Amino acid sequence: MTKADIIFKENIRKIMEEGVFSENARPRYKDGNVANSKYVTGAFAEYDLSKGEFPITTLRPIPIKSAIKEILWIYQDQTNDLSVLQEKYGVQYWNDWEVEGTGTIGERYGAIVKKHDIISKILKQLEENPWNRRNVISLWDYEAFDQSAGLLPCAFQTLFDVRRVDGEIYLDATLTQRSNDMLVAHHINAMQYVALQMMIAKHFGWKVGKFFYFINNLHIYDNQFEQAEELLRRTPSEVEPRLVLNVPDGTNFFDIRAEDFELVDYNPVKPQLKFDLAI
């Protein structure tokens, strides 16, 4: 069993056995009912990408390409415009979070990246001094929240650091999420930010190192308990999937495309499970 599958099953069991139920929940299912969840707090995982450990489960198929396209929309296009996500990338699942009448998700994610010129600053800092300890992406902007409606960012903070090991420079990343839907979004979010880590590493010709993942509220919605039990019953693959970025070292961050990524040795258990999302 891969490391990701071990962690996935452990987290499902912990939530189902030790979790508590939410109260006064904000999300709603499409039928209008309150989307309560069972949750635990303070979940943490560590993956050493340089040793082939990747945070993707084989217990069900994960749509990696659309997840990577979303990260390009946020950090390359730097926009909140849903038409860009749909027309350029063919991704539509953010439509449910459109701020009515705006064609956007509000002043969130890509809009905040652009507002603060975050990626240019991160790349400049790493170029001038790779060992600086100030490489922080923060999408938590109270001013923007006051000015615009919209879902507050779940994956809201990413930090980068470097290590030199045997003459090679490795880029590590830490992703912090305030909230995470364990069954639907957990591995999507993790692999998105691994892709971002790989893009920055390629920009400088570095190797990817470790990926640290902290989630404040890790939950399973109350209409997903049957799917959770099914995932626990499934027998995962013994082969570790790998995400590969097929561009030369030194490729500019903004020139990398979704098709440059390849998921190798990925043979997830089927059939796919269906989930009614909480909005």
Curated annotation (Swiss-Prot):
Q: Where in the cell is it found?
A: Cytoplasm
**Source domain of life:** Bacteria
Fetch the SUPFAM superfamilies from UniProt.
Answer: Thymidylate synthase/dCMP hydroxymethylase
User: What is the species listed in this Swiss-Prot or TrEMBL entry?
Assistant: Streptococcus suis (strain 05ZYH33)
Where, in this chain's numbering, is dUMP bound? R133, R134, R178, S179, N180, D181, N189, H219, I220, Y221
Q: Which family does it belong to?
A: Belongs to the thymidylate synthase family. Bacterial-type ThyA subfamily.
Q: What is the lineage of its organism?
A: Bacteria, Bacillati, Bacillota, Bacilli, Lactobacillales
Pathway-wise, it operates in: Pyrimidine metabolism; dTTP biosynthesis
Q: Locate the residues binding (6R)-5,10-methylene-5,6,7,8-tetrahydrofolate.
A: D181, A278
Q: What's the protein called, per UniProt?
A: Thymidylate synthase
Give the EC number(s) under which this enzyme is classified. 2.1.1.45
UniProt keyword annotations, A-Z: Cytoplasm, Methyltransferase, Nucleotide biosynthesis, Transferase
Reactions this protein catalyses: dUMP + (6R)-5,10-methylene-5,6,7,8-tetrahydrofolate = 7,8-dihydrofolate + dTMP
**GO terms classed as biological process:** dTMP biosynthetic process; dTTP biosynthetic process; methylation
What does the protein in this record do? Catalyzes the reductive methylation of 2'-deoxyuridine-5'-monophosphate (dUMP) to 2'-deoxythymidine-5'-monophosphate (dTMP) while utilizing 5,10-methylenetetrahydrofolate (mTHF) as the methyl donor and reductant in the reaction, yielding dihydrofolate (DHF) as a by-product. This enzymatic reaction provides an intracellular de novo source of dTMP, an essential precursor for DNA biosynthesis.
